[in-house]
């Protein structure tokens, strides 16, 4: 095996694509069922009322309503407050 880097070779030149993580819908925004709220690695935000968690820890809305961020037992949670029923 060569231990010298031969002519015009380089050990650099690799980089990974960004994962585009973060909050996608912020507090007070109205969402419909199935919309992604937070993309994350691990549970930085925990699912609350009307919020589901995917296999990659993505949080998504289970029903339509307004997004609400809060804390419960010292954990950051994301809830969906259902929109008021139309009369």
Swiss-Prot record:
Work out whether the entry's keyword set contains Ribonucleoprotein.
yes
Q: List cellular component terms (GO).
A: cytosolic large ribosomal subunit
InterPro entries (UniProt xref): Ribosomal_bL27, Ribosomal_bL27_CS
Q: Where is the composition biased (Polar residues)?
A: 7-19
Alphabetically sorted, this entry's keywords are: Ribonucleoprotein, Ribosomal protein
Q: Which domain of life is it from?
A: Bacteria
Q: In its UniProt record, which GO terms are filed under biological process?
A: translation
What's this protein's family per the entry? Belongs to the bacterial ribosomal protein bL27 family.
Q: What is this protein called?
A: Large ribosomal subunit protein bL27
Lineage, highest ranks first: Bacteria, Bacillati, Actinomycetota, Actinomycetes, Mycobacteriales
- Name the gene behind this protein: rpmA
């Amino acid at each position: 095996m060569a231990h010298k880097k031969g002519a015009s070779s380089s050990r650099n030149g690799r980089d990974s694509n960004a994962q585009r993580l973060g909050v996608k819908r912020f507090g007070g925004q109205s969402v419909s069922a199935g919309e992604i709220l937070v993309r994350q690695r691990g549970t930085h935000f925990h699912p609350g009322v009307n919020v589901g968690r995917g296999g990659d820890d993505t949080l998504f809305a289970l029903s339509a309503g307004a997004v609400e961020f809060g804390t419960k037992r010292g954990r950051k949670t994301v809830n969906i407050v259902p929109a008021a029923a139309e009369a």
